[in-house]
From Swiss-Prot:
This is Probable pectate lyase 18. Glycans are attached at N37, N191. One of its GO terms (biological process) is pectin catabolic process. Disulfide bonds join C159-C178. It comes from the Eukaryota. Its EC number is 4.2.2.2. Residues 1-20 form the signal peptide. GO terms for cellular component: extracellular region. It is an enzyme of class 4 (lyase).
Amino acid sequence: MSTLFFTFSLLLLAPLLVISSIQDPELVVQDVHRSINASLTRRNLGYLSCGSGNPIDRLLAMQPQLGKKSPAFSYCAIGFGKNAIGGKNGRIYVVTDSGNDDPVNPKPGTLRHAVIQDEPLWIIFKRDMVIQLKQELVMNSYKTIDGRGASVHISGGPCITIHHTSNIIIHGINIHDCKQSGNGNIRDSPNHSGWWDVSDGDGISIFGGKNIWVDHCSLSNCHDGLIDAIHGSTAITISNNYFTHHDKVMLLGHSDSFTQDKGMQVTVAFNHFGEGLVQRMPRCRHGYFHVVNNDYTHWEMYAIGGSAAPTINSQGNRFLAPNEKYRKEVTKHEDAPESQWRSWNWRSEGDLMLNGAYFRQTGAGASSSSTYARASSLSARPSSLVGSITTNAGPVNCKKGSRC
């Protein structure tokens, strides 16, 4: 990597393009792929490194032994979702039954029975499980789903819905192959069930949610989005996740006409956007979005996009462009003529651009710190550290009775 150096060019009277030039592109790309392979190896070893430069992993590595509730776990959160406390003040609920999913009268010991309770709960799993739901899993507030110590998969059916609830932490879960559900009754609390229309088939759907933290999950191959946050959702952190094999990865904002999303604030940090991804990493509307210290190793159309004048603050990320000549641009300004999107506030600061990647800056530009104050949620680390920061992205293979 010593042969790498940056040159940023300013195009007069046009949106800014952030580009980097490298002396030997092939060597740099090979080095990045070696880094990715090493990260996968370390992840499978089953421990978190305090020296990775990742502040969440540093704190998680100091937590008590698995199987014991740690109130300090919630204090590991960073970014706009840092106030998500999950089930910190509640008892431990152990999921023992991976089957018997009854959407209306869930059986005690199932994940569905746990997430609908009115009280705060810290939900853990007795053993490795594959959970195939019959209807979407509608969560009540103040819940932590903690998959550490087991290999937990939610797949093959509808997946997770956070609907007008708050203070939810989802950690260490494999979420994949999520399907649409049909119309049907679903219980969302011990005392209420109601009729739900067909779901979108998202991995995690956040609808009017607040104080949400999704961390160290793997997400792939769902019917619609992997994570979608819409309808006034805010105070969200999406961190340390491993995204693969999907088209429309992450939607933040319901529609161009839904102006209630103007107050949305989302942090996307320390994630690895890996093989088989096409677009929306994320796609933003209206609000304020801090995209920081992520590793983008694959995209087919674009990485970061948006419409309806979102403020996007991209800092300290690593972007490895595809080899195809016309797919080098990181960004995509959508659903507006250039005369409009030129004024949208999108900046790239300290990002590492590889293999011809470039970021089209618009609006106030990188130097206007006040413009990006509402889209700033933590201090970015240097992009040269992204490989180590994201080395444990996705669920970590922790063992019960020991620290992660």
